[in-house]
Structure formats: C-alpha cells, structure tokens
C-alpha cells in the first residue's frame, strides 16, 4: 500500500532509509539553516542514539561572507565542494525559492545524495520530478517540513493512512494570516496594523509579505497535499488563489453577525468522475 502514481516514490524514499550517516551538508545559512546547525549540535546525543552513529555538519553552502563566524571553516561558496566529497551522503536544503535550490538539489540527487527540505515552493513546483530523480539514483527526497512546520501531516498521509482513500482536505495551513485575522477580530484592528505587528514579530516578511497575505504560501502547501492525495502532480499555478489583503474590519464584523469567522482555508476535493479541484 501507499501513494499511487509518481508520489508513491515518497513512500519508497521513506522506506529506503538514509541512516546511519555521519556527515551532512547544509545549503543556505539563513534562519532555517542556522537553526538546523543549532539543533544538530544541541541534540547531538539523541540524534547519534537514533541514527546509530554521530552526525556531523561538515559543510555549509552560502555565497555570503562568514569569515568572522566561529564556524568559518565549515563554509563554502561552491556546490562542487559538497558534490566532490564522498563522505557527504545527506544534504539539507534551506536556501528557499527555486532559482538556486532547484538546480543544486537536482545535482545532489543525481549524485546519489539524499536531500531533506522544507522548501514548499520547490516541492510544489518540481516535487514529482525530484522524487523520480531520487528513485532513479537510489536516494531519498524528503519534505515533511514543507507543510505544517513541526506538525507531521505528510508522513501520516502516506503511512498511517495508507489503507485510506483521501477524497477531501480542508484546513488552515498559513499561520501568519491566521494570526492576523485573529488580531483583526479580537482587537478591532485593521489589516495594515495587523500586518505590521506580524512583521515586527517575524511572522511575515518585511520587504514582501505577499507569499502569506496573497495566499501563495497556502496555495503551494495545498498543491503538495493534493498531489500526495491523488498521486498526480498538482501545479500551484493551476489552483485559484485569493489571500486576505482585501479583508476589512467591516467584513469581520459582518461574519460575526452570522456567527461565523473569516479564515484563509486551503482545500482539495476529489469529484465522483475522478476529477479534482483545489483552492
């Protein structure tokens, strides 16, 4: 049992196993990448116990200058450093986006290295292709953290619910907009003020919060879940998407009068004719 079609490869990746391992590389050293390094060090003993041997971060790929960092010796600006080292069997991708992450992940998988990522844009756009590539080269392409953050949903879908037919998915998958809508409702706050607070707290991007407030983040997440549910790649560009940018306090009050609340809901439905819809 497991996922049908190309997304069965995700189950095969999980079952193939990538442990035990000794040395890994991190691609990208922003908030997520630095967090991965911190967790690897802080939880080194428990990771070693579960993996069967110690896990060490040998390289960090980032084009910026970290010469003043205590970990300066780990940094490289070239993907070739990772690809030319036979000790590196697992790569953690935290670059984000697709411009650099996608070709780098392709090269890692083609070289037989397993990749773990939380990059929802890359998974939503190229997931089926990268899963097939991983299978071809006996590697694993794992993306549990791309939806739900620390809340497991992908593994339960393809393992715990392997005997079930998933015909519908519906839920709140973007925490930033949920935080903003809650603020707007409880504190009678306008959109701009709620967004400013979300940005100050680090929930929303300061320069361009569009991924959250315009619904693109939620769109990518439901594309991933829909793909796993139906076994075929669902492209985010084919999913009608609307965010919360136009929601006003008046809208929220009108919903309250109907004993309702405004939420950004991502959904997937399978029709009786075998067709599917998502939004």
Where do the language-model regions lie?
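Predominant activation on well-ordered alpha-helical scaffold segments within soluble catalytic domains
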Residues: 33, 37-41, 131, 154-158, ...
């Amino acid at each position: 049992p497991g996922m049908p079609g190309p997304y069965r490869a995700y189950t095969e990746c999980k079952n193939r196993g990538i442990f035990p391992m000794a040395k890994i590389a991190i691609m990208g050293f922003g908030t997520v990448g630095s967090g991965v390094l911190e967790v690897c060090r802080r939880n080194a003993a428990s990771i070693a116990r579960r993996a069967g041997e110690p896990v060490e971060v040998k390289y960090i790929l980032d084009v910026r200058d970290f010469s003043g960092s205590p970990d300066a010796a780990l940094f490289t600006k070239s993907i070739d450093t990772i690809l030319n080292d036979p000790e590196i069997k697992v790569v953690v991708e935290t670059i984000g986006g697709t411009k650099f992450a996608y070709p780098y992940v392709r090269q890692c998988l083609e070289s037989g290295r397993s990749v773990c990522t939380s990059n929802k844009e890359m998974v939503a756009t190229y997931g089926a292709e990268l899963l097939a590539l991983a299978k071809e080269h006996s590697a694993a392409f794992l993306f549990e953290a791309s939806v739900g953050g620390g809340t497991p949903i992908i593994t339960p879908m393809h393992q715990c619910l392997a005997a079930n037919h998933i015909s519908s998915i519906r839920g709140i998958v973007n925490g930033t907009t949920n935080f903003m809508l809650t603020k707007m409702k409880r504190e009678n706050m306008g959109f701009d003020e709620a967004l400013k607070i979300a940005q100050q707290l680090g929930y929303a991007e300061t320069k361009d919060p569009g991924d959250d407030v315009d619904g693109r983040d939620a769109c990518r997440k439901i594309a991933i879940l829909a793909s796993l549910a139906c076994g075929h790649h669902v492209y985010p560009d084919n999913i009608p998407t609307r965010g919360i940018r136009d929601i006003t306090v008046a809208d929220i009050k009108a919903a309250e009068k109907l004993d309702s609340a405004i939420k950004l809901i991502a959904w997937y439905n399978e029709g009786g004719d075998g067709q599917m819809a998502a939004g």
